């Protein structure tokens, strides 16, 4: 038993927020699964780093550049292969839990973030290209992305809805998921295999706010927001409306804590893992945070602790004139821009 097994017993999955060819081919990912990692997430920044720093791509890049393909098609050829390989490594985990764990995420192009139909078309194409039941397509949680979520769920595709900072936007996502499930059920189709995670970003909130807050609130607001979002989640998914869908096989959306590597060196390096452990959630962690948590983290159900204190902290920043929904919109736009820039850097060597 490892600390990751202890976390899993508390109802939370730990995923790895990283993917590269070396990680898969070296057996390192398989070893991480033996330790208790339950899935993998990727994004344009992760692939940009992998392509630049992993020598295993060099021959394929050279070969693909001899073919009549666009840079994006060359990228997708390699990314789809990596995700398919990672899905293979995670398949035993996926099957051992009846399809509830062992997912690997691949993100649609950041340029589609405001294009619902384009997102749907690309998500369908990528999902078909990967060809694995434990593939999850990652879609940004813009209004267009949430519209796409409804359609993709009704198609039977599992989705990782990413770049959530807003509780209100997260609730909109739950409603879109429920509509997609209802459509599929109305068509007489199975829903039990569909899983959606709502990726709620953590550390970027504190990074944005800490310079403006009194010391007593520094490093506290991201966790307070996450705890409040979890209360919202409990209310939504225990309500009679969703219970009716659940009775027909629907799974609950799971909150996934993302951006859980600590950015401020003054904070404990496992802060955003230790503080957010709770049932029906996922935490996707970068390699350094995973190693730190295995070394000196604490497996304890903390997510439901201090709920009143979290609400009080949120009320206090509201009294200071900070509107968390306005902040959330700005952070999402910043995140989209970062992924667009990473995507451009990723494609540049593939021209």
From Swiss-Prot:
InterPro entries linked: Aldolase_TIM (IPR013785), TAL/FSA (IPR001585), Transaldolase_2 (IPR004732), Transaldolase_AS (IPR018225)
Reaction equation(s) it catalyzes: D-sedoheptulose 7-phosphate + D-glyceraldehyde 3-phosphate = D-erythrose 4-phosphate + beta-D-fructose 6-phosphate
Cellular location(s): Cytoplasm
Pathway: Carbohydrate degradation; pentose phosphate pathway; D-glyceraldehyde 3-phosphate and beta-D-fructose 6-phosphate from D-ribose 5-phosphate and D-xylulose 5-phosphate (non-oxidative stage): step 2/3
GO cellular component: cytoplasm
GO terms, biological process: carbohydrate metabolic process; pentose-phosphate shunt
First-level EC class: transferase
UniProt EC number: 2.2.1.2
Family matches, as Gene3D superfamilies: Aldolase class I
Domain of life per record: Bacteria
Similarity comment text for this entry: Belongs to the transaldolase family. Type 2 subfamily.
PANTHER family: TRANSALDOLASE (PTHR10683:SF31)
Record protein name field: Transaldolase
Native source organism of the sequence: Neisseria meningitidis serogroup A / serotype 4A (strain DSM 15465 / Z2491)
Taxon lineage: Bacteria, Pseudomonadati, Pseudomonadota, Betaproteobacteria, Neisseriales
